[in-house]
Amino acid sequence: ETEKRSRLQYVLPAVIVAVALLACQGSEKLSSTDQKWVKLDAAHWPVEILPELKAIEKEVPQGTPIFNDMLLGGFLIYHTPGFRVFIDDRCELYEDEFLLRYVKAKKSDFDAWSNQYPFHIALLEIDSNYRKYFEDDKKWFVVKQDRAAVLYRKIIQ
C-alpha cells in the first residue's frame, strides 16, 4: 500500500501536467481574441471595433498616429501595432507635466496636440472627457461605437 501511494504521488501530478499541456496546445499561436477559452470583456475593451481598427491599420502607413485614451493604449499596441499610440498606461514613460496636462486637458491642449501629432484616427472610451472635442468638430465622424469605446476618423480635405 505504501508503494501504491508512492507511485500515485508521482503519477497524479504527471497526469495533471499532461492534461494542462494538451489543453493549451497551440493556444500560444492564437491572439487573445481568437482563443476560445480566453476572451476580453467587451464591456471594457473595444473588441467589437477591432475589425474596423485592423482594416484602417492596413490602409494607412505604418506608424500613423492615433489619438487614444490612456487605458486603450496597450490594447492598440497589442492588437494594431501599426498605429503610433498617443498615450498608454505605462505612465513611467511620460513626464509628469505631460500626464497632468493630459488629465486636465482643455480644448487648447487638444488643438495643440492635434497640430503636433497630426492624427486622423481616434479611439476613445465611451465615457471619455475627450469625446466632446470630437463631437463638436464636424471634421470628425464616428466609424463605429460599441459598449467600451468609440472609433472616430477625421475628414481629410
Feature locations, PLM:
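Short, basic/hydrophobic alpha-helical segments
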Residues: V47-P61, S108-Y117
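Periplasmic/luminal catalytic loop of GT-C fold multi-pass membrane glycosyltransferases
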Residues: L99-L151
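Soluble non-cytosolic domains of exported or imported proteins
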Residues: H44-V47, F67, S108, E125
